Amino acid sequence: MPGGVTVKDVNQQEFVKAFAAFLKKSGKLKLPEWVDLVKTAPHKELAPYDPDWFYLRAASTARHLYMRGGVGVGAMCKIYGGRKRRGTKPAKFRVCSRGVSRTVLQSLEGIKMVEKDAAGGRRLTSQGQRDLDRIAGQVATAMRKAQ
């Protein structure tokens, strides 16, 4: 970690892209069979266009757990929820697919990055926090070189 850079110190979009690339390159994250067929939420009309959307969702979830531990499946569904357009009726908020959120958290548990919290929800392990900080350091050095 150059200079003690943490996830909170870097641009979140650049970090999520870099961490998703790390997850894909490592090959440890187990992808479900239905990853190319599923819609991510009831308020979406189509499935994601990006074939690596599962890695991006896992990276975003890991970053959120870094910022606030003790978050469960229900809270993750609220975070990734959105506005459902219902035609002439007023729009309403809809949570995302619980199956997708649960599968992402279970996949992160499978690579020992997340563990269940005794108080409820899930939190990062020390290994997971170390990986996130290491990637944040790499993003920070890349951003410094780009300037």
Swiss-Prot record:
Keywords, comma-separated and alphabetical: Ribonucleoprotein, Ribosomal protein
GO CC entries: cytosolic small ribosomal subunit
InterPro entries (alphabetical): Ribosomal_eS19 (IPR001266), Ribosomal_eS19_CS (IPR018277), WH-like_DNA-bd_sf (IPR036388), WH_DNA-bd_sf (IPR036390)
One Pfam family here:
Ribosomal_S19e
Keyword Nucleus tagged = no
The domain of life is: Eukaryota
Q: Which GO terms describe its molecular function?
A: RNA binding; structural constituent of ribosome
Determine if Ribonucleoprotein is one of this entry's keywords: yes
Gene Ontology biological-process annotations? ribosomal small subunit assembly; translation
Extract the PROSITE patterns matched here: RIBOSOMAL_S19E
Q: Which family does it belong to?
A: Belongs to the eukaryotic ribosomal protein eS19 family.
Stated name of the protein: Small ribosomal subunit protein eS19
From which organism does this entry originate?
Answer: Branchiostoma belcheri
